[in-house]
Structures are given as C-alpha cells and as structure tokens.
C-alpha cells in the first residue's frame, strides 16, 4: 500500500498510545503523562485536549472503520457533554478536574472553536443529533457573546465577562485578538457547515430551520475568511501576523512558521467547503505566498524551525509544527505541482520518524526537540499535547494517495 510507513505510524504508534490514555473510572482521557511515561490519573483534564481527542477518534473511525475507534469517540463525547460543557452559563470550560468537576472555568473562544470542530466530526461519524445541537449552541454563544462588531475576541470569565488573554498570549504581549483563534474559528465553522450540509441532505434529520441556520454559518465563515485575508495577512512580510490589539494593530514582529504552513492549507480547505469563487480566488495567492515563505526561510532540507521574533530564530523542532509542515507541503504539491514541495514533505516526514517519534515502547512523539534532535524535557501528554496534528497528518496523507513515505 502507498505510505505504508504512515499507516503503521497511525495504527501501531499513535492510536495505541491514545487508547491507553482512556480513563474508564472517571470518564474521558487522562490529562497528563510525564516524560518518563507516568500517567497522573489525578491531573486536571484540559477540555481542549478532550475535544481534540474526540475529533481524532471520530475522524480516524470514518477512515479506518474500526469499531474500537468509534467507542473511544463516544467515550470522549460523553465526557464533553457531561463535564466540559457548562450547564449553568453555556460554553466549554478551559479544564476540569480528573473527576469532571470544573477546574479552570475560563471560557476561551479558541476552546469553543475546537469543541465545534470535534462535535461536527462526531456528527459526521455517528449522525448524533445531540452532538450537532451542542455544536450549534456553542456557535451561537461565540457569535452572541465572544465577538464585537470588528471580529472575534479571546478570553472570558465563566459568565462571559471579558478577561485577560493569558492563555493565547506569549512573547511578552497580551493580545486582544489573535490569528490563532481566528484560524480555528474558520476551521470550526467549515466543519460545522460540512456537517450541516450532510444533515440538510437527509430528510429524516434536516429541515428548513437547519438550512437557514447553515446559511447563517456560511455567511459567518465567509466573513472570517475575509477578515483573515484583510487584517491578519501581512503581504509585505509574506506571513500572518500573530498578536493584535482590538484595532488590529500588530503587537509584535513574529513569524510563526507552524501557523503559516497550517493556515496555507486550512484556508484552502475552508474556501473549498464554502465554495465562494471570489473568496477562493483571493486566498490562492496568500496560501502560495505562505508556503513559499516557509519553504525558503524555515526549511533546512530536513525539518522546520519554530518561529522568528525580531530576527531571532527559535530553532526548536516542535511536534505540531513538523506535522503541519508535512501536510502543508503535501497540499501545496497537490495544488501547484511543484516537486520541491513533495520532496520537502518527504524529508520532514523522514525527520519525524527518525527524531520526533519516541522509540520507547508505549510512547508517542516528543513534543519538542533541540536543533540537534535532542529531546527537551517536556511531558508526553498535557492539555496542548494531543493527537490532533500528528493524527490528522497521517489521515490526510493516507487519504491523498500521494506517495511521500
């Protein structure tokens, strides 16, 4: 089979690892594994981690048709609806205790987006009306309380009063708007539109209200894509700027190579779902520009550096940056036919399999490596360390049918 090494990475490394993180006593999946592979069964559980696990198992099930994957997706869904979703104020918590009691009750727009992304995938995998209903409720909460007339805001208290955006701000700034949140709003709304179209096409499940709601979400998706194009894309620097104040003034000179290469294909994917010719045509040159910049500036022939701030390059190799780079270059090769992009995807995948993948039995990928390939002291699982990026990389490679492994 094509990309057999990728298939084995998915089925013999990534899936078994996350299967073992399932918490059958308290629900969901364990929230923390140390670098020495010790599971802390009393660690808080990040709701973003649970959403990404839900998305991963739902999507993996649709491709592999393994009932065990469906069971894990159902397990993650039950935890989301029972514990991650706030029955008092709505929306998704930032984290809960190991037993599901609320821990960090912050409501972050980014976190809501990933819940929608996951619930949409779960609906596509199962046809669960309950899942798509929760996704719609979260969408309405975002649109009603987590944005202003100019775009999307970031962090809120449990009852949706504005709060400092410490969770998605870094590098010494406190951002009121971020490229990262908007990118994943686009991702979430695209997935929701795709799921709603499936629902509307089924007379037993969809009705006129669903079609009207779908049209509203399509309009919001179009507006979000235009916002990314008009406010976040920096044509002079060939990148997406990262952190902004409320008036869309960029707060820092930062190039995030991982986000740029991820956005290069996610924006194309979203535009394809929206099927708006004008928006699609306006995004093509942006996607091409982002890929070319990453290829010329961040790719050393084997892997991708992390980011560049004020001319200072961070040369760490981050698991998700490498995974998204494989996918970004693969998608660029599909669009543009440039052999150097297929070769780049091949080389980065080889680097991942050689260096980023932890060869220890019962482990998965190292979160971060130094420039020389030495693993940094990072946990194997935490709220941000998840199967979303590397799992999606494997699934998209396999679905593409393009040999890069």
From Swiss-Prot:
Catalytic activity line of the entry: D-cellobiose = beta-D-glucosyl-(1->4)-D-mannopyranose
One GO molecular-function entry: cellobiose epimerase activity
One Pfam family in the UniProt entry: GlcNAc_2-epim
Thermal properties: Optimum temperature is 35 degrees Celsius.
Cross-referenced InterPro entries: 6-hairpin_glycosidase_sf, 6hp_glycosidase-like_sf, AGE/CE, Cellobiose_2_epim
UniProt note: pH dependence: Optimum pH is 7.0-8.5.
Protein's GO biological process: carbohydrate metabolic process
Record's signal peptide: none
UniProt similarity note: Belongs to the cellobiose 2-epimerase family.
Official protein name in the record: Cellobiose 2-epimerase
Species whose genome carries this gene: Eubacterium cellulosolvens
Gene that this polypeptide is encoded by: ce13
């Amino acid at each position: 089979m094509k990309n057999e090494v990728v298939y084995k990475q998915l089925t013999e490394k990534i899936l078994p690892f996350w299967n073992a993180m399932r918490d059958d006593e308290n629900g969901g999946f364990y929230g923390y594994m140390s670098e020495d592979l010790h599971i802390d069964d009393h660690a808080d559980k990040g709701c973003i981690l649970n959403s990404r696990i839900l998305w991963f198992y739902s999507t993996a099930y649709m491709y592999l048709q393994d009932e065990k994957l469906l069971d894990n997706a159902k397990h993650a869904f039950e935890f989301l609806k029972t514990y991650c979703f706030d029955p008092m104020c709505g929306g998704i918590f930032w984290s809960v205790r190991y037993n599901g009691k609320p821990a960090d009750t912050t409501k972050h727009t980014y976190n809501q987006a990933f819940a929608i992304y996951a619930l949409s995938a779960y609906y596509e995998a199962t046809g669960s009306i309950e899942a798509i209903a929760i996704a719609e409720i979260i969408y309405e909460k975002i649109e009603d309380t987590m944005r202003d007339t100019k775009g999307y805001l970031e962090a809120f208290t449990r009852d949706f009063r504005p709060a400092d955006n410490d969770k998605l701000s870094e590098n010494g700034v406190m951002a009121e708007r971020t490229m990262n949140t908007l990118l994943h709003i686009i991702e979430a709304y695209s997935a929701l539109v795709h799921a709603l179209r499936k629902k509307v096409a089924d007379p037993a499940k969809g009705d006129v209200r669903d079609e009207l709601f779908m049209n509203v979400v399509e309009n919001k998706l179009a507006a979000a894509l235009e916002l990314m194009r008009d406010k976040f894309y920096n044509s002079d620097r060939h990148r997406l700027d990262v952190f902004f104040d409320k008036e869309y003034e960029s707060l820092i000179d930062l190039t995030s190579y991982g986000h740029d290469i991820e956005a290069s294909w996610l924006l194309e994917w979203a535009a394809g779902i929206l099927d708006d010719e004008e928006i699609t045509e306006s995004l093509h040159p942006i996607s091409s520009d982002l890929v070319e910049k990453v290829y010329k500036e961040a790719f050393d022939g084997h892997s991708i550096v992390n980011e560049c701030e004020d001319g200072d390059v961070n040369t760490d190799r981050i698991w998700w940056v490498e995974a998204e780079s494989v996918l970004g270059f693969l998608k660029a090769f599909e669009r543009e036919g440039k052999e150097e992009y297929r070769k780049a995807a091949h080389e980065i995948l080889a680097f991942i399999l050689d260096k980023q993948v932890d060869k220890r039995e019962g482990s998965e990928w190292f979160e971060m490596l130094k420039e020389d390939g030495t693993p940094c002291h990072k946990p194997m699982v935490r709220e941000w360390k998840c199967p979303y990026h590397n799992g999606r990389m494997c699934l998209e490679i396999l679905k593409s049918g393009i040999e890069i492994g």
